[in-house]
Amino acid sequence: MDKRHDPSRRIIAPHGSQLSCKSWLTEAPMRMLMNNLHPDVAERPEDLVVYGGIGRAARDWDCYDKIIEVLKRLEDDETLLVQSGKPVGVFRTHADAPRVLIANSNLVPHWANWEHFNELDKQGLAMYGQMTAGSWIYIGTQGIVQGTYETFVSVAKQHFGGISKGKWILTGGLGGMGGAQTLAGTMAGFSVLACEVDETRIDFRLRTRYVDKKATSLDEALAMIEAANQAGKPVSVGLLANAADVFAELVKRGITPDVVTDQTSAHDPLNGYLPQGWTMAQAADMRKTDEAAVVKAAKASMAVQVQAMLDLQAAGAATLDYGNNIRQMAFETGVKNAFDFPGFVPAYIRPLFCEGIGPFRWVALSGDPEDIYKTDAKVKELIPDNPHLHNWLDMARERIAFQGLPARICWVGLKDRARLAQAFNEMVKNGELSAPIVIGRDHLDSGSVASPNRETESMLDGSDAVSDWPLLNALLNTASGATWVSLHHGGGVGMGFSQHSGVVIVCDGTETAAKRVGRVLWNDPATGVMRHADAGYEIAKNCAKEQGLDLPMLKD
C-alpha cells in the first residue's frame, strides 16, 4: 500500500475569520499547507504532489495528518520542525521565533543526485519539496506568471525593439510552472504554441483561462498561430504532442519561431519528462520496473529537443533556457554545445535581482477575493509612479483566475516590500480586510538561491555554485521573526543543482506583527542586494548605498 496515495482525500483550506488553531501564526501555515493540496491548485493532490514532477507538500498522508494535528495544538512560544515533509519535533522557543522550520530534500553534496534521492524516497526517508510545494506557499500557476511576463517583455525589448505583435513563442510543458507561459506570453503580446503530452493539463489550462485553444496536430496549431498573427491579436495554443517531436519537426520544415524556450519537467528525467514515442501509461509502468531505462530514454529525447533549440537559434530564433535544467540533461547525453543558448536569469532578469526585486506574493486567508482587490489598490496607492506595475495588476485582475485561496503576485524590491507589508498589516488592524494576509515569495529570488544553471548562472565573479547565500538568507529570516522558514535542495533544476530558501510571514494586524514584518521584509530582499553587490554588480552596489545597507566589505 502506497501511504502517499489516497484518492478519497479532498483538501480545502478553511475560509473566514474563525480559527481552527490557537492563533493566526499557526492557522496560517495550516491553511497554506491545505491550500497547496486544493484540487484547483495541486497537480496530483491525491498523491500530495503539488507541482514540478514529484514536488510534494508532505511526505505521506500520515505525516500530513500529524502536521495538521500539531499545528492545531501548537502554542505561540513553540516551533514545529519538519524534515522532508515529516513533523519530527516541537520545541519551546519564543513568541518572535518562527512557528515552523522546514528542511526538504537536503543531501550531503557527494550523495546529492537523483539516484540516491530516489532510493531514499522509495524507502519513505525523504521528500522532494520543489520550491513552494514543500514550503506551503504555492499559489497555483499565478505564482510564476509575472516573472514569465517580465521575461517575455525583456525578450521583446532586447530582440524586437519592444514590439511583440505578430510574433510567436514555441515552448513545451503546461504543468504547474509551464502553464504560466501561455498566459504570460499573450499578456506580453506574443502568440504562444505550447506542447504538452498530458491532455488533462491542456484542458485544465483552458478551464482556468491560461490557454485559449487546443490543437491535436502541428498543422492545426500552426494555422491557429498564423491566423492570430494575421489578425494582430495574440493567441495561446496547447498542442497535444511531445515537445521533442515538435521542435525537431519545425527544424525539418524550416519553420522558425520568433522565440524558443521550454518548461517541461526536464529537471526530473524519471518522473517529469515523457520520452519520444512513449505513452504516459507505458512510462508509468516502466517507472515501476526499469527506472534506468526511463531515465536513459528521457534524456535521449531531451538531447533531441535541445539540439532542435540550438538549430532554431542558429536560424534566428531568440532562444532561452527557462530554468528546468534541460541543457544539463542534453549535455550529459552528448550535446556538447547545449549551453550555447543562455538561461533566462542572466539574459533578462538579473538587473532586477540586483535591486532585490523579485516575486513578492500574498494570500488572503479569508478566502475573499475582495481582500486581494483592496490590497491591489493599496499597492497602486503606495507605488503611484510605476505604470508597468499598475498595468500588471490590472491585467492580473482581469485575466488570472484565482486557484484556491485568493492570491496576488507582483515583482517589487527592497524599497517597497516592507512598507507594502506594513500597510497590509494596518489594513487588517483597521478591519479593511476581513482576515489576516500571509506574505511569501518563490525561492527563485535575488538572495535566496544558489543554482548555477539558473538563478546564479554566469555570476560576475564566478561564484555561481557558492551556496552560503541561501543558508545565510534562511538564518537571517529565522532571526528576524518570520512565521515559517524553509531550506530546500534541488528545486527547479533537480538534485545536485540547487539550494534555496523560502520565507512566509503573517500580517495579523498586531503591533508585534508590524515589527516582525518590518524586519523580515527588509532583511530578506536586502540579502539579495548584498549577494549581488558582493559579486561586483554596480546596480547592486548603488542600491546598497542608496538604501543604507551596512556591507562591511563594500568599497566606496
Curated annotation (Swiss-Prot):
Keywords: Cytoplasm, Histidine metabolism, Lyase, NAD. NAD(+) binds at residues 52-53, 130, 176-178, 196, 201, 242-243, 263-267, 273-274, 322, 492. It is found in: Cytoplasm. Pfam families: Urocanase (PF01175), Urocanase_C (PF17392), Urocanase_N (PF17391). Its main location: cytoplasm. It catalyses: 4-imidazolone-5-propanoate = trans-urocanate + H2O. One of its GO terms (cellular component) is cytoplasm. Binds 1 NAD(+) per subunit. Its cofactor is NAD(+). One of its GO terms (biological process) is L-histidine catabolic process to glutamate and formate. Pathway: Amino-acid degradation; L-histidine degradation into L-glutamate; N-formimidoyl-L-glutamate from L-histidine: step 2/3. Its EC number is 4.2.1.49. InterPro entries: Urocanase, Urocanase-like, Urocanase_C, Urocanase_central_sf, Urocanase_CS, Urocanase_N, Urocanase_Rossmann-like, Urocanase_sf. The keyword Aminoacyl-tRNA synthetase does not apply. Belongs to the urocanase family. Catalyzes the conversion of urocanate to 4-imidazolone-5-propionate. This is Urocanate hydratase. It comes from Shewanella oneidensis (strain ATCC 700550 / JCM 31522 / CIP 106686 / LMG 19005 / NCIMB 14063 / MR-1). The lineage of its organism: Bacteria, Pseudomonadati, Pseudomonadota, Gammaproteobacteria, Alteromonadales.
